[in-house]
Curated annotation (Swiss-Prot):
Cofactor(s) the protein requires to work: Mg(2+)
Binding site for Mg(2+) 2: D223, E224
Stated name of the protein: Anthranilate phosphoribosyltransferase
Pathway: Amino-acid biosynthesis; L-tryptophan biosynthesis; L-tryptophan from chorismate: step 2/5
Catalysed conversion reaction: N-(5-phospho-beta-D-ribosyl)anthranilate + diphosphate = 5-phospho-alpha-D-ribose 1-diphosphate + anthranilate
Gene that this polypeptide is encoded by: trpD
UniProt: anthranilate 2 binding residues: R165
Record-level Gene Ontology MF annotations: anthranilate phosphoribosyltransferase activity; magnesium ion binding
Higher taxonomy: Archaea, Methanobacteriati, Methanobacteriota, Stenosarchaea group, Methanomicrobia
Highest taxon of source: Archaea
Length: 353
């Protein structure tokens, strides 16, 4: 570890191989003092795409990986978090809608660190058993087309980073590694980031990690495609990274206000998700639809995100998305769900029977 620290002190970048090895030491043998010094030294220098790709590889080397056997491409909708608008759980709802539209979804997520409700929190509120063993998540993806991977279950080595991260209390490279370390090795992803300046960096990293089709975006303070204003996108496709912006008008949805999509506790966000899947129209549905459309697009089921929007809408209006959520709850919990709760937007965590 001393070698890597000295390189940072001297202002030198690490190679991808060095970064991978450094992450291995961080997760296995480095002291808390060494970890803190390394992380802050890297933050002050600024991470390169080679370094971040190496860190991701180092994490994946010790992860509990799974390889679902599926037709087509696996897609993840995991973002970095850091939403300044405290919205509903958009990427969680989008994952369900995309799965109902025919996308095979390997959803990587965690409990909330930056908001009231993370993907794990709202899934738990809905009745999904979130801490399945890896082999059961693999079966979920293969059998029903969607699975949820709770990050600590698949990245147990990261447990030793909880203390140092809390003590540092600033954003570091670990805030962006979650979406880069999907335990299935999903080749297609839609990733929202908390800072526009991260879009191209993340796209470059994902290219180096061998991804095939990725959209990395930031919209008006959100790690989502925004319906409040324009969204900046870095898209990786066929080995080429391109930049462009998306507006609500281009996507055919109404421009919303921040108050229209505000979320709350896991229970409140679970209610909102069920209202959307039961067909309730409005700004919350619109932002879920455009983000689900992005997942449908990178999966290759539509030629553009705009062309994917009707597929997302149909998945909701036909109740396929609601039924997909029921499948996920029943598969993971082993219990039948309360249909009345699903159809009225009640919390399901205590309603499975």
């Amino acid at each position: 570890m001393k070698y890597y620290l000295q390189k940072l002190i001297d202002g030198h970048d690490l190679s991808m191989v060095e970064s991978e090895a450094a992450m291995g030491q961080i997760l296995e043998s480095a002291t808390d003092a060494q970890v803190g010094a390394f992380v802050m030294g890297m933050k002050m220098k600024g991470e390169t795409s080679d370094e971040v790709a190496g860190f991701a590889k180092g994490m994946l080397n010790v992860a509990n990986m799974i390889r679902p056997k599926v037709d087509g491409i696996l897609v993840d909708t995991c973002g970095t978090g850091g939403d300044r608008h405290n919205t509903i759980n958009i990427s969680t709802a989008a994952a369900i809608v995309a799965a109902a539209a025919g996308v095979t979804v390997a959803k990587h997520g965690n409990h909330s660190f930056t908001s009231l409700s993370g993907s794990a929190d709202v899934f738990k509120e809905l009745g999904v058993k979130i801490d399945l063993e890896p082999d059961l998540v693999k079966s979920s993806i293969e059998d029903i087309g969607i699975g949820f991977m709770l990050a600590p279950k698949f990245h147990p080595a990261m447990k030793r980073m909880v203390g140092p991260r809390k003590e540092l209390a600033v954003r570091t490279m670990f805030n962006i590694l979650g979406p880069l370390t999907n335990p299935t090795g999903a080749k297609a992803q839609v990733i929202g980031v908390f800072d526009k300046d991260l879009c191209n960096l993340m796209a470059e990293v994902l290219k180096k990690l061998g991804k095939e089709h990725v959209m990395v975006f930031h919209g008006d303070g959100m790690d989502e495609i925004s319906t409040l204003s324009e969204t900046f996108v870095a898209e990786l496709k066929d080995g080429i990274i391109s930049n462009y912006t998306l507006t609500p008008e281009e996507l055919g949805v109404a421009r919303a206000k921040a108050t229209d999509i505000v979320g709350g506790t896991p229970e409140e966000n679970a209610h909102d998700l069920l209202y959307i899947l039961n067909g309730e129209k409005g700004a919350k549905r619109d932002i879920v639809v455009v983000n689900a459309a992005a997942a449908i697009y990178v999966a290759g089921l539509a030629i553009s995100i705009k062309d994917a929007i009707p597929l997302a809408e149909e998945a909701i209006d036909s109740r396929k998305a609601l039924n997909k959520l029921k499948e996920l709850v029943e598969f993971t919990s082993g219990n039948k769900v309360d249909n009345e709760a699903f159809n009225t937007g009640q919390s399901l965590r205590n309603e499975v029977c």
